[in-house]
């Protein structure tokens, strides 16, 4: 094996510097380095290209960061078990980004706390469900549970086609 270093004497002191051959091998190995994108698994040959590409994922990173903060907040605050959870159906795109399979739905998510009421509304249809966790729960997911559902249907009146209603939205205090 060749020694790619040589000694240089500078004012009575010896200094070891790499030779030109060693610099060439360092350049070759640095050009072979691959920088993967953590969101879409694309690979880039320079960190600058990866950085530019990651700007395209800014919305996804923000959504993932918000979801993590909300999850941490709920799990670190004991008083929240008395508050109802209002659920809306997340888009499949956001479920996939957050690490849930594309087939996931709201029902797949872990319950926050036993006996925690859950409200869900889809326009005229309102559901209140209270989950009672059993002994077979593992890791926050309920294997067996009893769900009490209070289901109400409300008549929603739509305005005539093409006619707008004028509503007074001012708040008089």
Curated annotation (Swiss-Prot):
Residue ranges, annotated region (Disordered): 1-27
Gene3D superfamilies to which the protein is assigned, alphabetical: Classic Zinc Finger
InterPro entries: ZFP3-like, Znf_C2H2_sf, Znf_C2H2_type
Location(s), subcellular: Nucleus
Span(s) of short sequence motif EAR-like (transcriptional repression): 167-171
Top-rank lineage group of the source organism: Eukaryota
Main subcellular location: nucleus
Zinc fingers, C2H2-type class: 35-57
Key words, A-Z: Developmental protein, Flowering, Metal-binding, Nucleus, Repressor, Transcription, Transcription regulation, Zinc, Zinc-finger
GO biological process, one term: flower development
Job of this protein: Acts as a transcriptional repressor. Prevents the photoperiodic and circadian clock-dependent transition to flowering in long days (LD) by repressing the expression of flowering time genes (e.g. FT, GI and CO) in the leaf vasculature, and by interfering with floral meristem identity genes at the apex (e.g. SOC1 and LFY).
Record protein name field: Protein LATE FLOWERING
Natural source organism: Arabidopsis thaliana (Mouse-ear cress)
């Amino acid at each position: 094996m060749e020694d790619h270093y040589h000694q240089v004497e500078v004012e009575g002191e010896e200094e070891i510097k790499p030779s030109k051959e060693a610099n060439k091998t360092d350049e070759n190995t640095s050009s072979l380095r691959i920088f993967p994108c953590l969101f879409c698994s694309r690979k880039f040959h320079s960190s600058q290209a990866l950085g530019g590409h990651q700007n395209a994922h800014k919305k996804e990173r923000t959504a993932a960061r918000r979801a993590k903060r909300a999850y941490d907040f709920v799990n670190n605050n004991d008083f929240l078990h008395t508050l109802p959870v209002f659920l809306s159906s997340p888009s499949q795109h956001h479920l996939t980004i957050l690490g849930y399979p594309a087939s996931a739905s709201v029902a797949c998510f872990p319950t926050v706390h036993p006996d925690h009421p859950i409200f869900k509304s889809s326009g005229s249809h309102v559901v209140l469900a209270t989950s009672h966790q059993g002994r077979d729960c593992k890791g926050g997911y309920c294997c067996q549970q009893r769900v009490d559902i209070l289901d109400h249907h409300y008549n929603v009146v739509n305005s005539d086609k093409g006619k707008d209603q004028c509503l007074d939205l001012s708040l008089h205090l």
